[in-house]
Amino acid sequence: MPKRTKLLPQQTFQVHQPRSLVSEGFTVKAMMKNSVVRGPPVAGAFKERPAKPTTFRKCYERGDFPIALEHDSKGNKIAWKVEIEKLDYHHYLPLFFDGLSEMTFPYEFFARRGIHDMLEHGGNKILPVIPQLIIPIKNALNLRNRQIICVTLKVLQHLVVSSEMVGEALLPYYRQILPILNIFKNMNVNSGDGIDYSQQKRENIGDLIQETLEAFERYGGEDAFINIKYMVPTYESCLLN
């Protein structure tokens, strides 16, 4: 009789899966086998930054400005206690530009209205002050607040036409001013209640950026376009085309 073969219990073998190695991109580890590259952090380019207390607000609260609030049939306006042409622009204009970062009434109203009044009456007093205006402009834009960006763009458009050579004087400062414009250039969607009132108020951020860049090119001299293009690669010339 043939001998029966005794079946042994089936042995199980554990298969060890290779552990994934998490690594940063563009490193030696990232090229190793079983390496999983960690994705980039969320950029937050459009994220609004918190505003800091402005020097403009402190000066206003101390009563350092020769201004008062006046009401008429058209609404609020600034009553200047001195002739605007006689103001010390080196002192006052940078302070008012510092107020571009304000969003609270009456500070934001006085800063914005005051800037436009001073640009309207400044003449040749404006050009020498340009270097002092760059940091307040940059600070306002860097808050990434849509309303503040729109207000600052309108101020920049007024600034370049306020006096001769101002547009050209801004050219060395494109690196400070234009990066935020490059980020928001294609943002043309109203983020409010679904009804787009923005074009009526000229609050359409993408259009305002386009208008501002065109103003920079028109008044910035022959090197303006190439310098704008360097900072905002999608910009196309309004003069060459």
From Swiss-Prot:
Top-level taxon of origin: Eukaryota
Example of a GO MF term: beta-tubulin binding
GO cellular component: axonemal B tubule inner sheath; axonemal microtubule; cell body; cilium; cytosol; glial cell projection; manchette; mitochondrion
A Pfam entry, by short name: ParcG
Cystine pairs: none
Function noted in UniProt: Microtubule inner protein (MIP) part of the dynein-decorated doublet microtubules (DMTs) in cilia axoneme, which is required for motile cilia beating. Suppresses cell death induced by accumulation of unfolded Pael receptor (Pael-R, a substrate of Parkin). Facilitates the formation of inclusions consisting of Pael-R, molecular chaperones, protein degradation molecules and itself when proteasome is inhibited. May play an important role in the formation of Lewy bodies and protection of dopaminergic neurons against Parkinson disease.
Full protein name: Parkin coregulated gene protein homolog
